[in-house]
Swiss-Prot record:
Its main location: nucleus. May regulate the turnover of mRNAs in the nucleus. The gene is UBA1C. This is UBP1-associated proteins 1C. InterPro entries: LYAR (IPR039999), Matrin/U1-like-C_Znf_C2H2 (IPR003604), Nucleotide-bd_a/b_plait_sf (IPR012677), RBD_domain_sf (IPR035979), RRM_dom (IPR000504), Znf_C2H2_LYAR (IPR014898), Znf_C2H2_sf (IPR036236), Znf_C2H2_type (IPR013087). A zinc finger (C2HC LYAR-type) spans 1-26, 27-51.
Length: 613
């Protein structure tokens, strides 16, 4: 079988594998491993001369010395004769091909072949002298993997080639074409790096030479403009881009140059003035010398006098300028001090005037007489108009309002009988600091009556609590009002009713117990009639709510309890203990809505219903 090597990827191939390899690789030439001849894609199929040698020896060494599969440091076929099975190194003959190859790959033959290779290497070194490694310019190793993909799909971006597997891609990377392109790529990169370094060095050198403040003449806020170039911009970014331009930089350089020249001139002038002021006598001597030289040269005396006068005048002017320059700073400081003193004097005068005005005060009795003539509404309007924020009048009004307990004390009603002072305090602490908190208790039962008082430390807390008078407290609706405020007169008139003559004889058909006529005031029941009334009310399944807890029998209807608490039959009077108003409807079977609602709401606890009306 003939063996070929691909010129592009360097892979060793048998003849039947050539068509498949051609479809995968872009190689156009193949070399025979035995004879070393080059063939194209078509002529390869007609090469059949090396069939016997390839079948005998397998893939042999190419003419340029590269092996196909294994690369040995020495030639194991050294000193072998192909005609006979004989080894000249070991001086041994073999009878067949198998013995021949077994001897060639043996240890003894390999050791002798290594010795021969070492001898040849020493001869080459003796013929060619050693070269210093330091003088050599070592070429950098090429990175063959440049342009190769790490994952599927396998391709080479440098050569623009696709591969079916990773092995074929690596074989392509070892080929000549890929190596040439990698060398070109490395050379281009080195050129780019060198040019970049040169440009960076030039830029740094230019920056070191000239350091210009680009922000000179730029506005810090809207409107955006450049005073040096007399240019306007729509935004800050456009202004900064203008500052980086060439024209603006040139104008900034000119501005800096003019400033430096002015500074140099001022320094030179100062030096000249100091020298002229200190060395005035020397200048006079120079003038005398000039005059004598002029006389020697034949100038007229009048001309000489003019020169002397001009020199004296200039010298005097320079001396005066130097003195003014020295004393200018002192004069400015003195003028500032004088201005400050004048301002202080004016302030003192104003204070004296205000003191004199304050000394003139009216008598308090006169003010009282004036205020008596005003009504309450007029006084309120006058104070409201004259008072201003931060004034003493407002502060005095607020302090007096905070001291007044009536402005800070709140009356709370509607909570349960089991509420304590701690519960009430925690419910109202969110509005402000509390000074006192009390719950009104019943002396007989020792339970709360359902109302209490909360006193805040400041008026602000009370105001915040009264913004919403109705609040939810422990699943109950609580009503808040100022303690000084009382219910309206209409309610009082209804509450202050005359005693009612209660007669329960009409209920004899329903109960055997008969109550004698007794006059009862509002909210009072005689202890003697407690047992008799309880017997009459037990038939309806409910005790009187005033006496505390009630008992319900199975199948009880709350409507009957509501009727028993107010009026059961036509003509019966109202007891006046379950509501604030009196009943006048003698012919109706149902009580008014307010009494019906109270009885139905507090059916389980009559005493609590009494306090929650």
């Amino acid at each position: 079988m003939v063996w070929f090597q691909c010129d592009d990827c360097g892979e060793n191939l048998k003849k039947p594998r050539l068509p498949r390899h051609m479809s995968m690789c872009t190689a156009t030439k193949f070399s025979c491993i035995d004879c070393g001849n080059m063939f194209g894609q078509v002529s390869v199929h007609y090469h059949n001369q090396c069939i016997t040698e390839a079948e005998k020896y397998g893939p042999m060494v190419r003419s340029n010395g590269e092996s196909s599969k294994q690369k040995h440091d020495f030639d194991i076929n050294a000193e072998l004769f192909n005609s006979q099975w004989f080894c000249s190194l070991c001086n041994a003959t073999m009878t067949c091909e198998q013995d021949y190859f077994a001897h060639v790959y043996g240890k003894k033959h390999q050791e002798k072949a290594n010795e021969v290779a070492d001898m040849d290497y020493s001869k080459q070194q003796s013929e060619h002298p050693a070269v210093d490694k330091n003088n050599l310019t070592q070429q950098p190793d090429l990175d063959i993997y440049v342009g190769l993909s790490n994952d599927y799909p396998w391709f080479c971006s440098l050569c623009d080639i696709n591969a079916t597997s990773e092995q074929t891609l690596l074989a392509h990377a070892n080929g000549k074409k890929h190596r040439v392109k990698v060398e070109r790529f490395d050379a281009e990169q080195q050129k780019r790096q060198s040019t970049q370094h040169s440009t960076v060095d030039k830029k740094d050198y230019s920056k070191q030479q000239i350091e210009v403040d680009i922000n000179v003449g730029l506005s810090n806020c809207y409107p955006w403009f450049c005073s040096l170039c007399n240019v306007k911009a729509t935004c800050q970014q456009n202004l900064l881009s203008h500052a980086n331009g060439r024209k603006h930089r040139e104008n900034v350089e000119l501005f800096d140059a003019t400033q430096q020249q002015q500074l140099e001139k001022t320094t030179v002038d100062k030096k000249d003035t100091t020298v002229n002021a200190s060395d005035g006598n020397s200048e006079q001597k120079k003038v005398d010398l000039l005059v004598s030289s002029g006389v020697a040269n034949g100038y007229s005396q009048a001309h000489k006098k003019r020169k002397l006068e001009t020199c004296d005048e200039t010298w005097k002017r320079e001396v005066v300028q130097a003195e003014e320059a020295k004393g200018g700073g002192e004069q400015k400081s003195e003028s500032k001090k004088a201005k400050k003193q004048d301002k202080e004097k004016k302030r003192k005068k104003d204070k004296k005037q205000t003191k004199s005005d304050s000394d003139f005060e009216h008598d308090k009795e006169d003010i009282k007489q004036l205020l008596v003539a005003y009504s309450k509404e007029e006084l309120v309007n006058l104070i409201y108009k004259t008072a201003e924020k931060g004034s003493r009048l407002i502060s005095a009004i607020l302090e007096s309002a905070d001291r007044d307990i009536a402005q800070r004390n709140i009356f709370v009603r509607g909570f349960g009988w089991d509420t304590t002072q701690e519960n009430l305090k925690t419910a109202f602490e969110s509005y402000g600091e509390i000074e006192e908190c009390s719950v009104v208790m019943d002396k007989d039962t020792g339970r709360g009556k359902g109302y209490g008082f909360v006193m805040f430390k400041t008026r602000k807390g009370a105001r915040e609590a009264l913004k919403r008078p109705e609040k939810r407290m422990y699943n109950r609706i609580v009503v808040c009002n100022l303690a000084s405020e009382k219910p309206g007169k209409a309610g009082k008139e209804q509450d202050m009713a005359e005693p009612v003559n209660i007669d329960l004889t009409k209920m004899a058909n329903q109960s055997e117990a008969v109550l004698p006529g007794i006059e009862l005031g509002r909210g009072h029941v005689l202890e003697k009639m407690h047992h008799q009334q309880q017997q009459t009310m037990d038939m309806f399944g409910q005790n009187m709510p005033f006496y505390g807890y009630s008992h319900q029998f199975p199948g009880f209807d709350p409507m009957y309890g509501a009727l028993s608490g107010n009026q059961m039959l036509a003509g019966l009077p109202n007891y006046g203990m379950f509501g604030s108003g009196m009943m006048t409807n003698q012919g109706s079977m149902l009580p008014p809505p307010n009494h019906l609602g109270m009885a139905g709401q507090y059916f389980g606890d009559g005493e609590q219903a009494w306090h929650q009306r």
